[in-house]
């Protein structure tokens, strides 16, 4: 009763491009990731249709129109909606795997429907009717089975304004977190030193002590401690961007064997090197266990503890976030030293890699400064999460 529906096109990503003056096209992937609930084309970007691929028949979007993603592997993402709040003079159409709806009877104000169709009550209804096994889908006929509450336009305006302001604050918070991450990464890349250089690009004023070259075996020792009698059941994995994390929570499954007695047992503050390489992590990843008191790791990992009289633990954890340790590995592992996703680096060779460090006093200064930035970043992430929880609470309580 609320929406009339219009045909959409099936243009795939190879028929779309950014940065031209051609008609814009909403691909369903952007509904899932990339666009806010309320789309403002004065700041949000849609791709343009590549020349020669404009559909023969189409319906231009109007402000207040909504678009739903008609398919997803996740029932929570089926019928995820966006609303065109401000077209900013642009011509836009709805594309692949979208459902284009319009309130032709003006029962709602511009900016309300996107949130109404994002509400918890609406998506509870969608989950009941979504069809499929691996891929869940809906069509416009399914909406006849769904209901949304429509309050007075005055109340709609208050609801939409509140939620839009929260969304804008979330967007600002996201940019702030991104800027802090960029700052931390830039400092890390400039404050540490490769073993083939004498100095790092960035030094703190008054710190002129020369850097020293060490081999891994000079400041750490290997851990081969086994998980006897399965004393620990927490299986860890290295996620390059998140550190040592619970394997089951991260993957939503465990790939470890039932008997964990043969796994390495590591304690909080100890390190592990994952020789698996992936995009952006050509030489694997080294992470310190920080989230849990202890955990177990496959014997494919190289685990070690450090001599804190030789190197500061926080300093080393940040050092391994940089790319400066890659040179030490590349010196012992040639281009062909990769086998089935693993770097072909022996334990002995790994502990023989060279690294260049500041004196202990400067190590602690560097670690302290980076700890302050990291704590600020974590505080801002916690605030971001609270804004998201607030929005979800309102989406649950303000709509029927």
Regions found by a protein language model. Name each.
Residues 13, 91-99, 108, 123, ...:
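A short glycine-rich beta-alpha junction/loop motif
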């Amino acid at each position: 009763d609320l929406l009339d529906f219009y045909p959409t096109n099936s243009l795939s990503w190879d028929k779309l491009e950014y940065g031209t003056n051609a008609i814009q096209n909403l691909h369903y992937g952007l509904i899932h990731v990339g666009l806010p609930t309320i789309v403002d084309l004065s700041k949000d970007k849609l791709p343009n249709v590549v020349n020669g691929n404009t559909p023969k028949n189409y319906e231009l979007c109007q402000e207040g129109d909504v678009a739903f993603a008609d398919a997803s592997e996740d029932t929570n993402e089926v019928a995820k909606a966006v609303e065109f709040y401000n077209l900013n003079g642009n011509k836009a159409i709805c594309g692949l795997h979208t459902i284009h709806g319009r309130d032709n009877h003006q029962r709602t104000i511009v900016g309300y429907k996107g949130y109404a169709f994002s509400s918890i009550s609406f998506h509870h209804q969608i989950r009941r009717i979504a069809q499929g096994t691996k891929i869940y889908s809906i069509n416009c006929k399914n909406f006849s089975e769904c209901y949304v509450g429509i309050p007075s336009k005055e109340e709609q305006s208050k609801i939409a304004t509140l939620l839009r302001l929260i969304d804008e604050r979330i967007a600002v918070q996201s940019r702030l977190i991104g800027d802090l991450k960029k700052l931390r990464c830039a400092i890390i890349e400039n404050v540490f030193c490769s073993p083939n250089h004498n100095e790092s690009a960035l030094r703190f004023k008054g710190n002129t002590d020369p850097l020293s070259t060490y081999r891994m075996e000079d400041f750490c020792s290997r851990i081969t401690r086994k998980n006897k009698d399965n004393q620990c059941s927490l299986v860890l994995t290295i996620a390059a961007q998140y550190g040592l994390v619970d394997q089951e929570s991260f993957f939503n499954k465990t790939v470890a064997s039932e008997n964990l007695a043969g796994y390495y047992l590591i304690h909080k503050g100890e390190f592990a090197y994952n020789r698996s390489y992936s995009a952006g992590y050509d030489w694997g990843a080294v992470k310190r266990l920080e989230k849990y008191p202890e955990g177990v790791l496959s014997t494919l990992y190289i685990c070690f503890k450090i001599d804190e009289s030789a190197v500061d633990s926080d300093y080393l954890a940040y050092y391994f976030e940089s790319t400066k340790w890659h040179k030490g590995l590349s010196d012992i592992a040639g281009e062909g030293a990769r086998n089935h996703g693993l770097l072909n680096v022996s334990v002995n060779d790994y502990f023989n890699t060279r690294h260049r460090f500041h004196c202990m006093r400067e190590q602690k200064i560097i670690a302290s400064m980076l700890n302050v930035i990291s704590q600020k970043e974590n505080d801002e992430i916690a605030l971001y999460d609270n804004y998201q929880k607030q929005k979800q609470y309102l989406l649950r309580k303000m709509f029927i």
